Amino acid sequence: MIVTFHIEYRTSWGEEVRILGSVPELGKNNPEQAVALTTVDGIHWSNEISIQLPTEGVVEYSYHIYRDGKAIRTEWNSFPRRIYLPADVKKSLRINDCWKNLPEQQYFYSSAFTEALLAHCERSAIPKSYKKGLMIKAYAPRINSKYCLAICGNQKALGNWDPDKAWPMSDANFPEWQAELDASKLEFPLEYKFVLYNKEEKRAEAWENNPNRYLAAPEIKANETLVIADRYAYFNIPSWKGAGVAVPVFSLKSEKSFGVGDFGDLKRMVDWAVSTNQKVVQILPINDTTMTHTWTDSYPYNSISIYAFHPMYADLKQMGNLKDKETAATFNRKQKELNALSAIDYEAVNRVKWEYFHQIFKQEGEKVLASKAFRSFFEANKDWLQPYAAFSYLRDLYHTPNFREWPQYSEYNAQEIEELCRPDTADYAHIAIYFYIQFNLHLQLLEATTYAREHGVVLKGDIPIGISRNSVEAWTEPYYFNLNGQAGAPPDDFSVNGQNWGFPTYNWDVMENDGYKWWMKRFQKMAEYFDAYRIDHILGFFRIWEIPMNAVHGLLGQFVPALPMSREEIESYGLSFREEFLRPYIHEYFLGQVFGPHTDYVKQTFIEPTETYEVYRMRPEFDTQRKVEAFFAGKNDEDSIWVRDGLYALISDVLFVPDRKDPNLYHPRIGVQHDFIYRALNDWEKTAFNRLYDQYYYHRHNDFWQQQAMKKLPQLTQSTRMLVCGEDLGMIPDCVAWVMNDLRILSLEIQRMPKNPAEEFGRLNEYPYRSVCTFSTHDMSTLRGWWEEDYQQTQRYYNQMLGHYGTAPAIATPELCEEVVRNHLYSNSILCILSLQDWLSMDGKWRNPNVQEERINIPANPRHYWRYRMHLTLEQLMKAESLNEKIRELVKQTGRNPEK
C-alpha cells in the first residue's frame, strides 16, 4: 500500500524532517532508522512510502527534526498518530499532517481522562473506506461517552448546516475523532464546523469555537483517500473540575482488613469515592520499605525497591484460604485483634502477615509458580524481581540491609544472583516466596486499578524523589547515585532546621548519558497501575538540597547543581571575606542562652577556648553533628536532648559553606540570618550579606536550574500518559513555575502555604486552573489540627479568609469545616483533593473525636512512626449517609461533577 506523508514545518539550514513509526518501512521505532522526508522549499516536506499491511492493520508514527544525523526536536508523542490501513492493497493514502506541539490542554490526553474520567469504553467502528475518500481527523478529548464529535457543513451528507443532522465521527482512536466522506459525492469548496452531538438524544448541543473551516477542491485520485489531520475542536462548555480524596493505603480500615489497609480495601475506597461523586483516590508510596522489621520501616518514602510493593498491602483473603482449619482459625482471631487497634501496630501486623505468607506459600506456592500467568509476570519483571528477592533474602540472612557489610554478594554480580535464584538451589524457597508475594500484589493492585477505571475513578500514585542508600537500586546500579551525600530540604514551614532524608543524590550526568532509562522504566512501570501521579519534591529535578554525610540537620547543605561564589565575588557585594565565616561562631555571651544550666558542662566537655577572648571552638572529637549524635545515642532524657540540639546549632552557626567539589568556592548558609554569627556582623556587613544572599537564593540560578530541569522533565513526563502533578512546596525559585507551565504539569496549591511570600493565606479564586488544590497534606496537620495550633493565625484566617466578624471558635466546628471545604471546592483548580480526615471533619457524628490521632507525619521528626488509621471502617463510611449526602451536594453545587 502506498502512503504519502506530508507535513508543513519551517526548518533552519541543515535540518531535515524524518518520520518514525511502528512498521519496518518507517524504522520500526528505531530513531537511527527514521525515514527522511524531502522538500523543495524547506517548509513543505513529504515522502511516498510503500507499506506492507501489518497484521493488526494499524500504523503508529511521529515526526522528528534531525541535524547532522541526530534528533534535535521531537513532536509531542504521548498520544501517537495512528492510521488504520484498509485491507485493499490497491488503496492509497495521502496524509496532510501538522506538527504537534504539547497541547495547552495536555491533561485531557492523559490516561486519567481517556481511561477513567472521560473514558469511551464502547468505541465506534473504524470509518468505512470509499473509492475516493476524504477523511477528516480532529482532537477533542473533552467529550464524555454520552457525546460524540460530529461534522456539520454545506453538504447534504453533512446536514446542510442543520446541526441535528451532522455526520457523527468515530471515536475508535479517542481522543482523536475521524470520519471518512465519499469524495465523489461532495461539492467543493467544502465548508464545515465541528459540533458536540448528544448520542442519546440525537441532537447537537454546541458549535465549536472556530470560524467555518474551508477546503478548496483537492485533487483526489481513484482508490485514494486524502486525510486531513491534526485539527482541534473546542467548545464553550464549563471547565471540567473534579474532587478527590487523599488517604494512605495503610490507613484504610475495613471489616476485612488485617490491622492495616490493603489493596482489597482500595477497591472499597473507590466505592466510597463513587458514592460521593469523587473522581480521584490519591495514595502515598506503596513500595517495600522493609529493612529492620521494626516500626522504623513504616516510613513509606524510604523504599528498598522502586518496583516491589510492600508485602503488608496484600489482601490475604485474595491469596487463598488455608486448608488447615485450626491454623485458619488462629489467623482469624489475630485478624480481629489487630483490626481492633486504633493505630497500626507495624511490627505485629507484618509479623503475622508473614506467618500467613509462609503458610499459604507452602500450600499454594508450587502451583502458582508453575502457572502460565506467573511465568508471564516473571519474564516481564525479571530485571528487578530477581535482585529484589535476592536482596530481601540476603538482608535477613545477614541481619542488615547494608549490603556493604554482607560477607558475600556485597558487590552485585548479575551472574551470581542468577545462580542464587535458580530453582535447584537450597535457598530457592526463601527467595521464591518473594516472587510469589509480588505476583499476588501485582494481581491485586491491577484488579483495583481496573475496578477504579471501570467506575470512572482515577488512582493517583506518588513517586518519591529519593531512594534508600541501602536498597536494591543502590546495590545493583550504584553508578546512578552519589552515595557520599544526603538529600534533604532547606528550612521551610515543615522544619526550621531543614530536612535530612538520608537518601543519596542522583548522578544526573550518568543518567543523561543513557537517556534517563532508569527514570523512564520507573515511570512506565508505575503507569501499569496508576493514571495520575504526584512527583514528590519536583524541585529535585531542578536541583537537590545535598547535605554532607557528617551533618544531621539540613542547615549545612547546598544546592546541587549550583553556581557557588568565589571570595572575589563575595567581596564585590561589599562584604570583606574572612576565614572565620567558615567556622562555627561560639561566643561566651550567648552560651548561657543556648544551654542554660548545662553551660559549664558544655564548656568542660564539648568546646575549648581559642586565642581570642571569650571565643570557643568545638573539640575535635565533637566537631561534626554526626560525632555529637554518636555521643548522645540512646540518651533520650530531656537534658541530653537539650545539650545535643544546642551543639547541633553551634556547629551549623557558620556564614558560608564550602562547595562540595571546590573548597575555594562558597555558598551562603541557608537561613543564617537567625543565627549568632549573622548578628555579630556590623550593619554594613549585614546589608552586603543580605544583598548577596537574596541574589544567590532567589535570582542567580533561575536560568541555570531551568536548563537542568528541561534536560530531564520533558522526556520523563511524556514517557507515559499518566496525569502529571508536581509537589512544588517549600523554597520555590521562579523557574519552577516556568517549567511546570511549559510542560503542563499541575501545581499543588495549599491555602496556608501560599506561593506569594507577601501573603499569609492563598486566594482560592486566583489558583491556576492547571493545579491541585488541598488544605492539608500528609506532612501537615489536618484542618481541625491546624485550627488549634496557632490561635492568632486562626483568628486572622477566620476574619480575613472566611469573612466572619468577632472571635474565632477555639475548635473547628463541623460548620466551619464545611465552609472551608466548600470554599476549596469552589476554587479554580481542576482538581480539589482533600484528605479523608478533612472530608470527615464536616460531620460531628463521623469525625474522629481525638483530633491528635489524625496526624499522619511530622516532618521535623525523622523517626516518626507512620501509623495513622481510619477510626471507622469503610463499611461504616459507606453507610454514613448524613456525611455522604453532604459531600455529594457540595460536589454538585461547586461544579465538580460535570455532566458534559
Describe each model-derived feature in a short phrase.
Residues 107-131, 135, 182-185, 215-900:
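Catalytic cores of glycan-processing enzymes that make or break glycosidic bonds
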Residues 2-8, 132-139:
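A short, amphipathic beta-strand motif
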Residues 10-56, 66-87, 140-188, 197-220, ...:
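Aromatic-rich carbohydrate-binding modules that target alpha-glucans
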Residues 6, 20, 38, 64, ...:
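Residues in well-ordered beta-strands of folded domains
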Residues 75, 83-88, 93, 97, ...:
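Phox homology (PX) phosphoinositide-binding domain
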